[in-house]
Structure formats: C-alpha cells, structure tokens
C-alpha cells in the first residue's frame, strides 16, 4: 500500500500541521474502503519499477531524467512495460532515461502560458487541485517551490505519480493525495493555489471558488485555468447532456463573467492573463493514450464547434489574490 508517512512528517512543523488532525484518518479510511478494482494491479507495477536517481534532472524546462551510464535495453523494456500497464497517460509529457511518455495533453504548453503571469514560486507552499498525474507538481518544483501538494481522487493518477517519483529519485517535495477539494478542511496555509481544468466540472462553481480561497493564506494567489466562451460579463454557457463528449460539464462562463465571479467571492486584483483555443496538436490521441481525443470531439465540418454544436474549447487563465 501507498504510505503517506513522509508527507505527514514533512508537514508536522509549519502552517500545515493542523491538517494532521484529520488527514491520516481520512487516508486510512480511503485505503480500507475506497480502493479501485484495478488499484492493486497499478500499484504492483509501481512496486516493480526500479528506484532510480538521475544524474541529470531537468524540472525547469520539462520533466526529463537522464543517467550518465545509460540503462540497458532490457531495463528500459521492463520499465516501459510497467509504465504502459498504467495507461492511459493524459497529462505530461515525461522523458525518463530515453523513454518518452507522449501523453494526450501537452501540459507543458499550458505551463508555458501560465508561468509568465503568476508570482514567482520560489520558496512557496503550493496546492494543485485536480492535479492529474502530477506533471505540474514537478514543474512547480522546477520553478523553485518548497512544497507542491496535489489532490486528485482518480487513483490511476496517484499510481502514475508514484511511478514517476520512484524514477526521479524519490523526491519528497511533491506529494499527491487521493482527495477532492471538498474533503479538505479550511487550511488557509498555501501561498499559491492552482485549479486548472476543474471549474467546469463543478455543479456549484462559486462554491468551488470559495473552497479554493479557504486554502490560501492572506495575500495568497489563486491561479485559475478553465474553459470559457467569448462574450461579456453576462454570458454563461450551460451545456446539455454533453460538451465535447464530456458528460459532467456544468457551467462555462465568459472570461469577464468569471472575473465577476471571483470578485463576488472576495478575490481582488483579478486579471485575465491568457486566452487560448485548444488545438488538436495540444490534445490528441497518442501511443500512450489510444482512445478518442479532441479531434473526435469536434464537428468534422466545422472545427470551430464541438460535435454537439457548441463553441470549440477556449481556455483562459485568471490570476487573483486573497486579501
């Protein structure tokens, strides 16, 4: 089973220590009661991976690990086999000793859009809500974060994260917890909180914004990345059964409406930092994610629309401060 003792030890001293009042019991209950049917299979693959320490590790420009003495073809084949048992790989890419995990999403492109607009991460304690396999946690460390904590209830992502961690030298500055934001107490302990690709999946988006705010220290920064539509402050799309083949999409506001929502929730200095149409180069089917992707979710006769007839995915980055 996955042990969280290193994380408990890491937060025992500092602003997050009060989380220990509830977190160990939550995660123990999760291990007892909530494991996915395939979890043991996925975690068995993690356990069969070698614990490697790279000679060169680049988290600033990507997630890339290399050895001075290359691994043997047999070692590489064994590692790749274990990693492929954890498909699909959606967020990345990762370059691990010559094994290139070409993920569905170019999450590095999103990071390049976000990073120029946010406060420097050096020395910060960070929360990444809905972090997926943790790709951006590693990039946060590359940008100088002291501690990067990701939460995501999808258990495959936890195993993917632990697999990458094992191949990167067991770094304890990044941690992924199998929780949703609604399971966190009001910690008010993070310098920066990221919520990227989550808001449109929430039935109550304003409640989500308050949940994010409650995790921030005073003067802390929220980085919010989500689907938006073109339009003024009064424009919000409420899709029907599906949006781009996704069932659980509830509200897609305009960027201006989202700015108003943030201000209504008490955030200040709200800025629309970036807007970008998602391309089929950024999100696509790969050898590591072989099912349908964005190209199949768009109208084949009009790529400016989803297959359901809605505007095709447009993503915005907003940055705001908790006073």
Swiss-Prot record:
GO MF, any single term: methyltransferase activity
Record EC number: 2.5.1.-
GO process terms (BP): tRNA wobble uridine modification
Top-level taxonomy: Bacteria, Pseudomonadati, Pseudomonadota, Gammaproteobacteria, Enterobacterales
Taxonomic source organism: Serratia proteamaculans (strain 568)
Functional note: Catalyzes carboxymethyl transfer from carboxy-S-adenosyl-L-methionine (Cx-SAM) to 5-hydroxyuridine (ho5U) to form 5-carboxymethoxyuridine (cmo5U) at position 34 in tRNAs.
Class of enzymatic activity (EC top level): transferase
Catalytic activity: carboxy-S-adenosyl-L-methionine + 5-hydroxyuridine(34) in tRNA = 5-carboxymethoxyuridine(34) in tRNA + S-adenosyl-L-homocysteine + H(+)
Protein known as: tRNA U34 carboxymethyltransferase
Keywords from the UniProt entry: Transferase, tRNA processing
Gene3D superfamilies for the chain: Vaccinia Virus protein VP39
UniProt KW Metal-binding keyword: no
Family indicated by similarity: Belongs to the class I-like SAM-binding methyltransferase superfamily. CmoB family.
Cited Pfam families: Methyltransf_9 (PF08003)
Record-listed carboxy-S-adenosyl-L-methionine binding positions: 91, 105, 110, 130, 181-182, 196, 200, 315
Subunit structure: Homotetramer.
């Amino acid at each position: 089973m996955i042990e969280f003792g290193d994380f408990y030890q890491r937060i025992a001293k500092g602003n997050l220590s009060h989380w220990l009042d509830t977190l160990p019991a939550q995660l123990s209950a999760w291990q007892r009661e909530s494991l996915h049917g395939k979890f043991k299979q996925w975690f068995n693959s993690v356990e069969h991976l070698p614990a490697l320490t790279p000679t060169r590790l680049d988290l600033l420009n990507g997630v890339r690990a290399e050895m001075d003495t290359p691994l043997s073809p047999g070692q590489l084949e064994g590692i790749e086999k274990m990693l492929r048992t954890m498909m699909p790989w959606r967020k990345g890419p990762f370059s691990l000793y010559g094994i290139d995990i070409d993920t569905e999403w170019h999450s590095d492109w999103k990071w390049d859009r976000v990073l120029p607009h946010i406060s420097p991460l050096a020395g910060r304690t960070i929360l990444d809500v809905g972090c997926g396999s943790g790709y951006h946690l590693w990039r946060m460390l590359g940008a100088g974060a002291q501690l990067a904590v990701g939460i995501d209830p999808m258990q495959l992502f936890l195993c993917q994260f632990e697999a990458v961690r094992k191949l990167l030298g067991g770094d304890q500055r990044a941690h992924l917890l199998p929780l949703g934001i609604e399971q966190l107490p009001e910690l008010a302990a993070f310098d920066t909180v990221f919520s990227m690709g989550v808001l449109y999946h929430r039935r109550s988006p304003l409640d989500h914004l308050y949940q994010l705010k409650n995790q921030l220290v005073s003067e802390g920064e929220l980085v919010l990345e989500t689907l938006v539509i073109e339009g003024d402050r009064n424009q919000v799309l409420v899709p029907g059964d599906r949006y781009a083949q996704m069932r659980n999409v509830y509200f897609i506001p305009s960027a201006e409406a989202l700015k108003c929502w943030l201000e209504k929730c008490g955030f200040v200095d709200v800025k629309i930092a970036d807007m970008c149409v998602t391309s089929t180069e950024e999100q696509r089917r790969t050898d590591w994610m072989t099912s349908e992707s964005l190209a199949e979710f768009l109208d084949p006769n009009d790529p400016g629309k989803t297959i359901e007839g809605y505007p095709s995915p447009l993503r915005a980055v907003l940055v705001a401060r908790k006073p």
